[in-house]
Amino acid sequence: TKGDKGISAAPFLNSYHRLDMYPQSMTWKLGDPIVDFQPLKGTTNEVGALFASLNFFDEMLYQKFTRESGNPLIKLKKFSESFGELVFPVVDFANYLGISLTDIQFLLYELTEFGFIDYDNDRMIITCYPKMFDYIDAQSGLKDFDKIIIQSKASVNAQLSLSSLDLKINGIERVLLSQAKKVWIMPTNNQLIVKKNRDMNFDGLITAGKTQYYGDGFSFLYEDFKLNLSKCDSMFIWADYKESKKAGQLVRSPSVIESLNGYIQIDDMDNKSGRDTSMHAFPKLYSNVETYVYYDDPSIQNGIYSRDNFMFIINPFVLDSLDKFTNQALSLNGTFMSGGIFPDFIDSLSLQEDYSLGFIRNTPSDGFNIYSQLASYDNEIRLSNEGLKGSGTIEFHTTTALSEDVTFYPDSLSAIAHTFTNIKQEDDPEIPLVKGQNCQVKYVPKENQLYANSIEDKFIFFDDEEADLTGGIVLGYDGLKGDGIMRFGKGEVQSLLYTYETDAILSDTAEFRLVSSDKDLDALSFKTQNLNARVDFGTRIGEFKSNSGESFVTFPENEYICYMDQFNWFMDNDDLEMKNSKQAAADINIDTDLDLAVSNFYSINPDQDSINFGSSKARFDVRRKKITCTKIEFIKIADSRIVP
């Protein structure tokens, strides 16, 4: 057991592991293969114990003993050298100093407590330990030293295996290996194994300057002064804050470098103290194998980039000055695999605006084919924890889109295109000229289709730019399709599915409307539904046929309704021709004695007492808002019939 002060507090000297050990007690049961170092029996709380390297040096401790007459360590050294022995009588040393035994004893107790000497009070003998000479040489700059102290706070501070001679130390928060280079370790389960001459095995965390490493099977080699990273699961980098108000502070990069195998050279093996500050390259990381950065974290585009095929493979590398490299200096060469979005290409990782590891690069002059398809992309590619993004030109079939905001997903491309152009194709299938601005674009390679949707600006169609679309279009090798509202002059068509020719709009099921004027597009003068539509800008005629026999037609401004099955709109004249080749609709229950063979017209003005009449043909003048009906047999008003 040990005491708290003086000779009783002197450390256990461990020459195999080369440690001064400061536990309260050492316990060994006869025949037991384990020696325990622990607090004294009866101690209820966990008690701290120190395990210090025999080459540990603390200048404050050295100066603690310095007096006006000098430092007693130097006097002990000089006397030992003059005496020619490391062991000598206390009386002789007291006479050498010219002081009494009583005056010197307290100093000798204190020097013994810190492991510089051994003072045998019974035999009145002083034994000088190597630590004393090392401290003097370290203070003088003649000898290197270290700063390694292991602090333990546990119910059992350490255990020595008599079979392997491994010293397992428990209750460790962290161990500083180099103060100058900012290297320390934090072992898993707060324990590590000390091997011969201060070598250590441990799992857990290593911090080396602005880098951190998590893993198992780590080892510290004292003589070489390096850390072996045999199984490093993950490496993190701490970057300098870019904001001026946070200058000098660090932020951890969200990117993880995985599967690292290599070692960290903490400092030159003869500069464990870090006193020689000219060695700027240390600490230095040597990565001996390919390492990987993945982008499958849920915070990155909801984790859509699978680590199975989307990664940056870093070549073996050397990274020096781990404690002071700049954001701009970090560059890790390797190969980017995008899961088939782009061809694999060589590049280098660096710190991005969000502090993640990524890159900004341009495509080759002729662009990249994307998704192994006929589509291509040209200009800037950006990789960060925002995902795989870019700003450039997207080309597919007859479409070219320019965007400053492109996001590449494994199964698709999404962009806000500030310019969208689909050139006209007169060969089969016919495709019209389409232009757009500030639209949403999505390319789906498995479907071989490009989708575009208007946001605020409409798509402009055809050579003369006579039609526009509020909605979406789909381009494939089978042609162009669309949905939404198409407007042309005073007419508009609404459909869930359009097909197109170079100068025509087609739809199997559509709603057709005419507006009162170009300025007021919400003031309807004509409306009908469920039509097969063809609007031809070559002939300047819109042809509409009812899909249900007759279509219900509304004239809001005229306050009339009718049923017709064919409509021809002559867009240059703003003139609509309506025909009915079938029986009048019979599902409107209006009291009338007419037995018409053509569709009925009905007034919906409550003051006109449900005026109705039959007409198989009519015209509607959009400009004048005038309905002209022909082949009317009579109009019944009250008890009278009017024959026009």
Model-derived regions: residue spans:
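Structural signature for solvent-exposed beta-strand/loop edge elements and short helix-capping sites
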Residues: 1-644
